[in-house]
Amino acid sequence: MKYQQLENLESGWKWKYLVKKHREGELITRYVEASAAKEAVDLLLGMENEPVRVLGWIDQHMNPALQNRLKQTIRARRKRHFNAEHQHTRKKSIDLEFMVWQRLAGLAQRRGITLSETIVQLIEDAERKEKYENHMSTLKQDLQALLGKKE
């Protein structure tokens, strides 16, 4: 495994994930009967700061259909947590309008590179163009000075 598992921290993440899913209306317990499900959820809500009990609750009460999604969520969260420790692996997010994202994704796909690489290429292209335009402007001014013309 690439990233160290931190039981207490990850238990907190699991608790938050399950509470979020419950608030979104998903069935987080294995119980069909509403009263048993409510009782189990109330028990979970009461153990926010008790990581060992959260793991026990998961083993005893959690809906088996959530098992894989919970594992994937925690694995992704663990990766983001450890990557955030180093500036070069830290990820940032930006908000894009859908049409902008769609065009950027299409360009990235045509070039066969990631969205980040596409953005870097576009920035480098713009910087080269700006440098070229400045160089051409300077050459034009120098040429006009040599020819003795004023604008």
Curated annotation (Swiss-Prot):
Disulphide linkage map: none
Keywords associated with the record: Cell cycle, Cell division, Cytoplasm, DNA-binding
Biological processes, Gene Ontology terms: cell division; regulation of DNA-templated transcription
Major subcellular location class: cytoplasm
GO molecular function: sequence-specific DNA binding
Superkingdom to which the source organism belongs: Bacteria
A cellular component term, taken from the record's GO annotations: cytoplasm
InterPro entries: Arc_rbn_hlx_hlx, MatP, MatP_C, MatP_N, MatP_N_sf
Gene3D superfamilies linked to this entry: MatP, N-terminal domain, Met repressor-like
Cellular compartments annotated: Cytoplasm
Function: Required for spatial organization of the terminus region of the chromosome (Ter macrodomain) during the cell cycle. Prevents early segregation of duplicated Ter macrodomains during cell division. Binds specifically to matS, which is a 13 bp signature motif repeated within the Ter macrodomain.
Annotated family: Belongs to the MatP family.
HAMAP family linked: MatP
Assembly and interaction partners: Homodimer.
Name of this protein: Macrodomain Ter protein
